[in-house]
Amino acid sequence: MNLSLLLFLIGILGFILNRKNIILMIIAIEIMLLAITLLVLMSSVSFDDIAGQTFSIYIISIAGAESVIGLSILVAYYRLRGTISLRT
């Protein structure tokens, strides 16, 4: 539980501190989602419940789809602006 909390806090710090870089923001969001998945997985193992393990697989697949959508938006943004920096 402490490991997942530490990973989630690292993800939040990465998201807050890297507001200008879109790629690092996407990576920070992925770290937060994987921390939540780890917490669900550890809870399901401790309670001997298969539903939590199934739900963790579902979370991982949603996180993968989210990263694909985010990176495709990033490619479209790069083609439009010529840079991935968020500075206005």
UniProtKB/Swiss-Prot annotation:
It catalyses: a ubiquinone + NADH + 5 H(+)(in) = a ubiquinol + NAD(+) + 4 H(+)(out). It comes from the Eukaryota. Its main location: mitochondrion. GO terms for biological process: ATP synthesis coupled electron transport. It is a multi-pass membrane protein. One of its GO terms (molecular function) is NADH dehydrogenase (ubiquinone) activity. It is found in: Mitochondrion membrane. Keywords: Electron transport, Membrane, Mitochondrion, NAD, Respiratory chain, Translocase, Transmembrane, Transmembrane helix, Transport, Ubiquinone. It holds the Pfam family Oxidored_q2. Its EC number is 7.1.1.2. GO terms for cellular component: mitochondrial membrane; NADH dehydrogenase complex. It is an enzyme of class 7 (translocase). The chain crosses the membrane at residues 1-21, 22-42, 55-75. Core subunit of the mitochondrial membrane respiratory chain NADH dehydrogenase (Complex I) that is believed to belong to the minimal assembly required for catalysis. Complex I functions in the transfer of electrons from NADH to the respiratory chain. The immediate electron acceptor for the enzyme is believed to be ubiquinone. Belongs to the complex I subunit 4L family. This is NADH-ubiquinone oxidoreductase chain 4L. The lineage of its organism: Eukaryota, Fungi, Dikarya, Basidiomycota, Agaricomycotina.
